[in-house]
Amino acid sequence: MNKLALYCRPGFEKELAAEISEKAAELGIFGFARVEENQGYVIFECYQTDDADRLAREIPFNQLIFARQMIVVSDLLTDLPVQDRISPIIQQYQAIAHQINLTYSTELLVETADTNEAKSLSAFCRKFTVPLRQALKKQGWLQGTRHHKQGLTLHILMLDSTQCYVGYSYNYNHSEHFMGIPRLKFPLDAPSRSTLKLEEAILTFLSREEEKKRLNEQMYAVDLGACPGGWTYQLVKRGLFVYAVDHGKMAASLHDTGRIEHCAEDGFKFQPPKRSKIDWLVCDMVEQPSRISQLILKWLVNGWCHETIFNLKLPMKKRYLEVKKCLQMIEESLEKQGFRYHIQAKHLYHDREEITVHIAVKSLD
């Protein structure tokens, strides 16, 4: 298997192709990306047979911005017999069983791309999963427990009922979610659907233990461009006191909590109140990404906060280039100022033409 399949939001295939090509080249691995617009995935074909497996192990998945999932895959299986789709799939796994330990594989996911056309296969995928799982277990595979981090997850990427890619991902270096998509329910008392963006960001960037330590009732936050309160809602729910900065009105339900102070000011001019030590800054303002990046830097460099989650709205063209430029500017500025920091960026499921960035400033040298 010399290919990687990487899932993404339809329309962002070119950005993902550029990103995976760059990350592979940094490891001295070369190949080419097969890209079809709006198909919801990219196939990166390596020139050397074992290189796809190496990429799946050595490129930290959490450093990929546009990828929802990363799996090593076979050549495309076509013309699967309607009466026996399982045997060709088993044969693909048998061909790699001497190299990859499939015994302690933990889970089987029969998936599609995140497109309307592909989703029409979802009922088929559910039905097909049961007999395929049984057949894999008969081979002595899928014997691991689900949370076995050193194990593998087996993936079947169905293009239609007769075509699929057969593959696997490493449990320590993949998305644990089906199709790479977290299933979040919209809270009925939240002021806007944007609340799901911050919830997904917190779940993506922080472990459960980190969330409890770093987002709690002893902390203060500032939400720039807060109206009507979708992001503020997530912070208040976790017990933080929030300075909600926006000329627009905040939802009455948030005022009723007693955990917010509405500051009717411009988010670019607002400065934190001296009486409070601000732990978190969040920002979902619609503005040029370079301007938002400069704003976030101002807060971090001035010591006004030590952790932040913010969105960068992307231009119509050269989106990956713009992302790289903004993140590089932030990193270089923090390093120049002597900061130690941790930065992550992700094109979340609930993001559209934007990415979400998390930065934690650890300390000053």
Swiss-Prot record:
Pfam families reported for this sequence: FtsJ, RlmM_FDX, RLMM_N
Keywords: Cytoplasm, Methyltransferase, rRNA processing, S-adenosyl-L-methionine, Transferase
InterPro entries: RlmM_FDX (IPR040739), RlmM_THUMP-like (IPR048646), RNA_MeTrfase_FtsJ_dom (IPR002877), rRNA_MeTrfase_M (IPR011224), SAM-dependent_MTases_sf (IPR029063)
Active site location: 313 (proton acceptor)
Alphabetized SUPFAM superfamilies for the sequence: S-adenosyl-L-methionine-dependent methyltransferases (SSF53335)
Entry's Gene Ontology BP terms: methylation; rRNA processing
EC number: 2.1.1.186
Coiled-coil stretches: none
Catalytic activity: cytidine(2498) in 23S rRNA + S-adenosyl-L-methionine = 2'-O-methylcytidine(2498) in 23S rRNA + S-adenosyl-L-homocysteine + H(+)
Record flagged with keyword Heme: no
Predominant cellular place of this UniProt entry's protein: cytoplasm
GO CC terms: cytoplasm
Enzyme category, top tier: transferase
Localization per record: Cytoplasm
Residues reported to bind S-adenosyl-L-methionine: 194, 227-230, 246, 266, 284
A molecular function GO annotation: S-adenosylmethionine-dependent methyltransferase activity
Family: Belongs to the class I-like SAM-binding methyltransferase superfamily. RNA methyltransferase RlmE family. RlmM subfamily.
HAMAP family the UniProt entry points to: 23SrRNA_methyltr_M
Function recorded in the entry: Catalyzes the 2'-O-methylation at nucleotide C2498 in 23S rRNA.
Quaternary state and interactors: Monomer.
Name assigned to this protein: Ribosomal RNA large subunit methyltransferase M
Organism field: Pasteurella multocida (strain Pm70)
Record lineage: Bacteria, Pseudomonadati, Pseudomonadota, Gammaproteobacteria, Pasteurellales
Gene for this chain: rlmM
